[in-house]
């Protein structure tokens, strides 16, 4: 074993809550308190050594009794905040991210993307800390730059502390709705049951020391040491971004979480069509801070990188590689088939292509695709097909096939991808819904709303084909015509009657309702309590087959009666249920 790496930390939260500013403040502490040659620069992430944290935090380390008890080398903060980076930090069976900071605006609480971030963190099972940011916005709060929160709160007026407590209380209440028990970090007694909330200010730096120390404590409590151990073998990593660089061609920014990557190595990763091979021509890393003289000359080529590292890979064959794809280095050509197999198996677990019923999912990266599918499954939504990239004509066909089994599955959910105009046109003409968005739970909420509308519409269509139960009584003194057709006044005792339904007496058919009139005007139906005139067509005469005062029932065919009883009973009113039960009893008696 080569040793223990630092945990990867991702910062997440709603837009404008101060994620980037918080990251800048954290990075600033490591720069200000670094020792010469201590800080290693990375592509896409920043290393904050534990020694720098100890120096920055000062007496708070002793107050929290952490001095000499922390064995992690430091933290590796992913430079790009947000759920996309978190999603792409994926590996088979879990997340490359070891810790997450959920940044919440203490003045406004959980918001849209904050909720999504929270659900993503929960779905991956990643330990997290909540930074209740914008502490400096609390009315009356007296700020001192970079002061630990525990020291700051002791120096405040009572009304500022009261306002803070009120805001934290509201946040705790909001979090409880998602099954999360939380409290201000210095009040947490059991970190296995409660999530710590650390009040911070990314503007003044207050609470940053507390945040870093709480992260250290959480990492040592929840991250097994074995997970942070790294070897000396071929590198394993994940692609975070693929782009074209002038003079270099297509490059991949990757995070190496185990092993070593060397110039000249063959790497196996993945694109839309499956596993891809590329030969490393150059490995690029940032120059050490003390060597950065010219802003234009910030990078240098290296012969190899060791985990954990963020590196830019220049290689032949990176075209079409997708972010979130695994990356395996191969040191022997004999190992190439096995590496391709491993990458292929991992991608096949993310991409879905089946003939089972379910929705169609499209996303922009392997990471976001995996997160989307995982989220949908947790919400009980089956997936028929899931792939990376914009929706295609084939997706529309698949959605049409899925709709045949369940109308609520005739949909394409598109996360952070553009919809080609020709595909959108075909979807519209085929009656396929495309729901596109950049916030996962918003897409899900829109899908739920749409699927409920589809379900309601489908049920309405089915119910419109079924005969609703009904029970009427011929009113004495209201016989207007005795035969051909019979016209009588009736009262609807239960259920519903409509033109076209057949009436029965004692289980035997007496005729069909031709028309219903209420106060001299034709109506399409009459419900319980209504008194109306009806015309009855059939071999029936008042005084023979029927008479004044008789009770008649709407005839419900046996198959439809079973449908009502075993599938759609909840859509019947109580009086309709009673009418159906009585009708079935009379039918049974008539056939005995």
UniProtKB/Swiss-Prot annotation:
Gene3D superfamilies: P-loop containing nucleotide triphosphate hydrolases, Translation factors, Translation initiation factor IF- 2, domain 3. Keywords: GTP-binding, Initiation factor, Nucleotide-binding, Protein biosynthesis. Pfam families: GTP_EFTU (PF00009), GTP_EFTU_D4 (PF14578), IF-2 (PF11987). The keyword Cell membrane does not apply. InterPro entries: EFTU-type, P-loop_NTPase, Small_GTP-bd, T_Tr_GTP-bd_dom, TF_aIF-2_arc, TIF_IF2, TIF_IF2_dom3, TIF_IF2_dom3_sf. GO terms for cellular component: cytoplasm. Residues 38-42 are annotated as: G2. It comes from the Archaea. Residues 13-20 are annotated as: G1. Residues 201-203 are annotated as: G5. One of its GO terms (molecular function) is GTP binding. GTP binds at residues 13-20, 79-83, 133-136. Residues 79-82 are annotated as: G3. Residues 4-225 form the tr-type G domain. Residues 133-136 are annotated as: G4. Belongs to the TRAFAC class translation factor GTPase superfamily. Classic translation factor GTPase family. IF-2 subfamily. NCBIfam families: aIF-2 (TIGR00491), PRK04004.1 (NF003078), small_GTP (TIGR00231). Function in general translation initiation by promoting the binding of the formylmethionine-tRNA to ribosomes. Seems to function along with eIF-2. HAMAP family: IF_2_A. This is Probable translation initiation factor IF-2. It comes from Pyrobaculum arsenaticum (strain DSM 13514 / JCM 11321 / PZ6). The lineage of its organism: Archaea, Thermoproteota, Thermoprotei, Thermoproteales, Thermoproteaceae.
């Amino acid at each position: 074993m080569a040793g223990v790496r630092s945990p990867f930390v991702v910062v997440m939260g709603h837009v404008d809550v101060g994620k980037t500013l918080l990251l800048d403040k954290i990075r600033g502490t490591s720069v200000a308190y670094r020792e010469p040659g201590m800080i290693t620069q990375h592509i896409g992430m920043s290393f904050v050594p534990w020694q720098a944290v100890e120096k920055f935090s000062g007496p708070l380390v002793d107050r929290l009794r952490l001095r000499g008890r922390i064995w992690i080398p430091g933290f590796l903060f992913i430079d790009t905040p947000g759920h996309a980076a978190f999603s792409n930090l994926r590996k088979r069976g879990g997340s490359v991210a070891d810790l997450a900071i959920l940044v919440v605006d203490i003045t406004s609480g959980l918001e849209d993307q904050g909720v999504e971030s929270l659900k993503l963190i929960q779905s991956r099972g990643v330990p997290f800390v909540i930074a209740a940011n914008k502490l400096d916005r609390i009315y009356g709060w007296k700020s001192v730059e970079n002061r630990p929160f525990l020291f700051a709160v002791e120096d405040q007026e009572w009304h500022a502390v009261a306002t803070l407590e009120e805001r934290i209380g509201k946040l705790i209440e909001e979090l409880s709705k998602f099954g999360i028990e939380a409290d201000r970090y210095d009040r947490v007694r059991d970190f296995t049951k409660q999530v710590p909330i650390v009040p911070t200010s990314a503007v003044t730096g207050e609470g940053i020391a507390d945040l870093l120390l709480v992260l250290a404590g959480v990492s040592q409590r929840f991250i097994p040491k074995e997970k942070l151990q790294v070897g000396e073998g071929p590198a394993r990593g994940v692609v975070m971004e693929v782009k074209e660089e002038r003079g270099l061609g297509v490059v991949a920014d990757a995070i190496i979480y185990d092993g070593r990557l060397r110039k000249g190595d063959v790497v196996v990763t993945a694109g839309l069509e499956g596993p891809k091979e590329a030969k490393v021509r150059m490995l690029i890393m940032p120059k050490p801070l003390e060597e950065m003289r010219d802003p234009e000359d910030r990078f240098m080529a290296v012969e190899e990188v060791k985990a954990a590292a963020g590196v830019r890979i220049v290689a032949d064959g990176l075209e079409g590689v997708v972010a979130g794809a695994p990356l395996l280095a191969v040191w022997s050509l004999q190992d190439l088939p096995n590496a391709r197999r491993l990458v292929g198996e991992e991608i096949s677990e993310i991409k879905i292509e089946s003939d089972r019923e379910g929705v169609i999912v499209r996303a922009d990266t392997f990471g976001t695709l995996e997160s989307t599918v995982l989220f949908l499954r947790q919400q009980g939504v089956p997936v028929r097909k899931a792939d990376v990239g914009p929706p295609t004509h084939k997706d529309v066909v698949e959605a049409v096939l899925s709709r045949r089994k369940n109308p609520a599955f005739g949909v394409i959910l598109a996360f952070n991808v553009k919809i080609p105009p020709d595909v959108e046109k075909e979807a519209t003409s085929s009656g396929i819904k495309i729901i596109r968005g950049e916030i996962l739970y918003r897409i899900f909420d829109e899908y739920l709303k749409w699927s409920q509308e589809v379900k309601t519409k489908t049920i309405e269509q089915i119910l419109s084909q079924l005969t609703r139960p009904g029970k009427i009584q011929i009113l004495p003194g209201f016989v207007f015509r005795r035969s051909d057709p019979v016209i009588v006044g009736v009262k609807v005792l239960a259920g519903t009657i409509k033109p076209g339904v057949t009436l029965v007496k004692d289980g035997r058919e007496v005729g069909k309702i031709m028309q219903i009139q209420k106060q001299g005007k034709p109506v399409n139906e009459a419900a319980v309590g209504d008194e109306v005139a009806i015309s009855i067509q059939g071999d029936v005469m008042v005084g023979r087959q029927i008479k004044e005062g008789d009770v008649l029932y709407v005839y419900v065919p046996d198959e439809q009666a079973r449908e009502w009883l075993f599938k759609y009973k909840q859509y019947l009113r109580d009086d309709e249920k009673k009418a159906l039960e009585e009708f079935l009893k009379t039918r049974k008696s008539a056939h005995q």
